[in-house]
Amino acid sequence: MINSISNTVLLKSVVSKRFFSSSAKMSSQAKPRHLVSMLELSIKELESLVNRAAYHKQQIRSGLVNTTQPLSGKTVSLIFNKRSTRTRVSSEGAAAYLGGCPMFLGKDDIQLGVNESLHDTTKIISSMTSSIFARVNKHSDIQEMCKYSSVPIINALCDTFHPLQAITDILTIKESFGNTTKGLKLAWIGDVNNVINDLCIAALKSGIDVSIAVPSGLKFEELILSGAKEISAENGTTLKITNDPLEAINGANVIVTDTWISMGQEDERLQKLKQFEGFQITKEMISKGKAAENWKFMHCLPRHPEEVHDEVFYDEERSLVFEEGENRLYAAIAVLEGFVVNKGKLL
């Protein structure tokens, strides 16, 4: 979970010239639909994906066997530049559930931007597989892969967006509050990163008011902020950003945080801990902030004690973290079904 990158990277595709094949040409076939962020989904499309995830969860938990196997005989590739627990297991599980064969390709397995350009690697892998789950470092990498892939690219995390987690979180909230999200309030206490970028958009599209508390000096990129404000105005939801966790928590039904120190930021640990002083979620904070009586806690994991106290994280009545983690599987199934099996037709 890395801080948002600059608008120039968001608004322009950056194509690396290193090792670029001069003879490469774009295919004339119709371009597939990709999942990059929550910004690209309509309100109805997001709702449909969440509902399909809930459906598959009910089927699996009921012990019903998926006999359709729509991806039978097809390979689903997972290109991961970063290590992962939930994303890898859920993506491979989703492919297997739909009858496909998952193929994991880590940074030590392929020549991803090292001895071969990202352009050439994407062209080759997409010619052999049905789809690509891409967990990469830079948002520009996702943009470049989408530009040159002949199959759907599913953003499994980049430094700006995390759409699979956002779909998961809306599913978790919906099933925890009487199968509805309308009129709820979500409080985010933590960093400005890829998780809240997509969760904020998804929540506002789902009828959830959003209040965000971040340390002084941290800012959202304008593309995210302007998109969130536009959605808020259109959908009748509210967005508030503050530096005070107690202010954000006031009246919140859902309290969410995430890691403060992402992969690759380990050298910044001491600086980060100082920056986030007073941001650990405790029951005292929740009480002082006057959260709603039915408040629940969420965290996409992995979790560290400085982010949230054990009394909150392991509270079986309040904490949804393990249900949330399991729901990653059903979100991945819904996305794979929607973007690969149904070729991006979500409604």
Swiss-Prot record:
Pathway: Amino-acid biosynthesis; L-arginine biosynthesis; L-arginine from L-ornithine and carbamoyl phosphate: step 1/3. One of its GO terms (molecular function) is amino acid binding. Disulfide bonds: none annotated. Residues 1-25 form a transit peptide. The active site is at C300. GO terms for cellular component: mitochondrial matrix. InterPro entries: Asp/Orn_carbamoyltranf_P-bd (IPR006132), Asp/Orn_carbamoylTrfase (IPR006130), Asp/Orn_carbamoylTrfase_sf (IPR036901), Asp_carbamoyltransf_Asp/Orn-bd (IPR006131), Orn/put_carbamltrans (IPR002292). It is found in: Mitochondrion matrix. It catalyses: carbamoyl phosphate + L-ornithine = L-citrulline + phosphate + H(+). Pfam families: OTCace, OTCace_N. GO terms for biological process: arginine biosynthetic process via ornithine; citrulline biosynthetic process; L-arginine biosynthetic process. It is an enzyme of class 2 (transferase). Its EC number is 2.1.3.3. PROSITE patterns: CARBAMOYLTRANSFERASE. Transmembrane segments: none annotated. Keywords: Amino-acid biosynthesis, Arginine biosynthesis, Mitochondrion, Transferase, Transit peptide. L-ornithine binds at N194, D258, S262, M263. Belongs to the aspartate/ornithine carbamoyltransferase superfamily. OTCase family. PANTHER family: ORNITHINE CARBAMOYLTRANSFERASE, MITOCHONDRIAL (PTHR45753), ORNITHINE TRANSCARBAMYLASE, MITOCHONDRIAL (PTHR45753:SF3). This is Ornithine transcarbamylase, mitochondrial.
